[in-house]
Amino acid sequence: MATTAELFEEPFVADEYIERLVWRTPGGGSRGGPEAFDPKRLLEEFVNHIQELQIMDERIQRKVEKLEQQCQKEAKEFAKKVQELQKSNQVAFQHFQELDEHISYVATKVCHLGDQLEGVNTPRQRAVEAQKLMKYFNEFLDGELKSDVFTNSEKIKEAADVIQKLHLIAQELPFDRFSEVKSKIASKYHDLECQLIQEFTSAQRRGEVSRMREVAAVLLHFKGYSHCIDVYIKQCQEGAYLRNDIFEDAAILCQRVNKQVGDIFSNPEAVLAKLIQSVFEIKLQSFVKDQLEECRKSDAEQYLKSLYDLYTRTTGLSSKLMEFNLGTDKQTFLSKLIKSIFISYLENYIEVEIGYLKSRSAMILQRYYDSKNHQKRSIGTGGIQDLKERIRQRTNLPLGPSIDTHGETFLSQEVVVNLLQETKQAFERCHRLSDPSDLPRNAFRIFTILVEFLCIEHIDYALETGLAGIPSSDSRNANLYFLDVVQQANTIFHLFDKQFNDHLMPLISSSPKLSECLQKKKEIIEQMEMKLDTGIDRTLNCMIGQMKHILAAEQKKTDFKPEDENNVLIQYTNACVKVCVYVRKQVEKIKNSMDGKNVDTVLMELGVRFHRLIYEHLQQYSYSCMGGMLAICDVAEYRKCAKDFKIPMVLHLFDTLHALCNLLVVAPDNLKQVCSGEQLANLDKNILHSFVQLRADYRSARLARHFS
């Protein structure tokens, strides 16, 4: 195994190195078994290898010493070189300081010399300038302009500078001595001003922005500079309104000018603001007037729609213009422009809105009643009418015929949707067009119109008509349409409440009008709920009355006391069948007409009255043994019917009634035991006794003794 330095590079493991050495030595490993193992040969190999390692170690050591000597030599040379560089750097730094001091000295001298030259040159330049102006002034005084600056059209810029200065000087001269020359200078001033504006106009038409900038810079010191801006604004608008959308045209125009105006004028914000002012006060104001004045008196609906649309689009344009630099208070500037256009229309907006909403709502309602061939009648309230209504509710006395509505509820979702849609649009216009301080008050006025026409003129009228159409409780085969009124009224209440929350609340949420609106809404709903409750109560009375008619007409005394006890089929009676059919139909109608807890409340009330009716009805008859079985079958059927109510209390009442009916058939000896049973134990003894008294064998079997 050759020994090299590479074998000892990291990672080096001595055990592995020995293992490899042994494995390569013949007779040193485990190959060939124990017989092949030669320890002498292995020892010899180890001795030789150790000698090789010693030789290699000496060789490496000599190499390390040589490298260390070389490193020390190079370190000394490098240190010497660094010292030389430090000395050289110190010399250079000294030279730099000397040069810096010399430069500062020279600069001071130059500045001093410059100040001296300027002190001499400035008066000289002023003198030269004054001399030139005197020369030009003499030409005006003589009446003949000979200087090249006035005769050469290419030097209009220099001429403008001269005439502008002469114009200022002429203003200081006395009029009586220099009136003629002042007049000539003023005339030349005006001519040059016109030439410059004409040059600016021509450059604008050619699209030469650089020339426009030069001329504008010259005109900046002339009185006609504002006229130059006016010309620029006028020419910018030529051909700018080619589309059908004036607002989009105006936005594009302002965007184009905004990109260009900074390259032409030194005061771009003022120029752009003046352009926008021109667009609003001339173009937009004229357009708005044409659109609105045409329909202001003849068509309120179109007027309001146009006003809302134009105002919205104008404010939308204003929002786009807010992106431009128009000076410090651009918000106020744009608001004033919008106000100047619309102020005459916004001052009386809410009066137009209220007037239109009233007439439109009245028309929607009248159109509906006309489609039904219905002449809206005045529903009496107060005094005699209220007294009649109370007596009608609490007795069965006929106090005049009820109104026959022929099944018509006089409620229309289409009418409601139309009224709500008109009001929604009115709220949107109110939000956009009202002054923030007037917004809650205006929104409240719109809400009162909605209450008047939707809640009072439509819903309340339908409820009153529905109440008047409910027959008395003793009417036979009465058609009960009030539940249809209830169903539609509930749907309309939900729509009304949704609009209140979605469209009115955001407009009044932070104002005192909120509590006023909530109170008005509460009063309206309470008033209508009271009428609904009254109508439902009277409808339930009619239902019970109809059941009474069925029972009176169909139930015979022989049903429960048959002549032939042996020839009786044990099933429910015909009266029971018809009552159950009627009740199931009414229960289904109630479930379809109401929602939530209202269904349970009404069904519980109907169930309690139904139970009372059957209880009192059963008390009218005498029962034989077989008749008692029939009564139990009837009550069992009534109980099945009561299950459809899904009201635990009603079911419990019929369970108890069913248990009471068992008293009609139980053997006399077991009567006391049954009375103390789980379902009857809590009942009053008189109730139990009253049922037992209905038995045909009450006297013969001496059943009274069980209750003595």
Swiss-Prot record:
Q: Where is the signal peptide?
A: none
Q: What is this protein called?
A: Exocyst complex component 5
Report the main location listed first in the record: cytoplasm
PANTHER family in the cross-refs: EXOCYST COMPLEX COMPONENT 5, SEC10
Keyword Phosphoprotein assigned to the entry: answer is yes
Coiled-coil annotated spans: 40-101
In alphabetical order, the GO MF annotations are: small GTPase binding
| InterPro entries, sorted | Sec10-like, Sec10_HB, Sec10_N
Q: Phosphoserine modification sites?
A: 412
Of which family is this protein a member?
Belongs to the SEC10 family.
Assembly information from the UniProt record: The exocyst complex is composed of EXOC1, EXOC2, EXOC3, EXOC4, EXOC5, EXOC6, EXOC7 and EXOC8. Interacts with EXOC3L1.
* The keyword Metal-binding belongs to this UniProt entry's keyword annotation: no
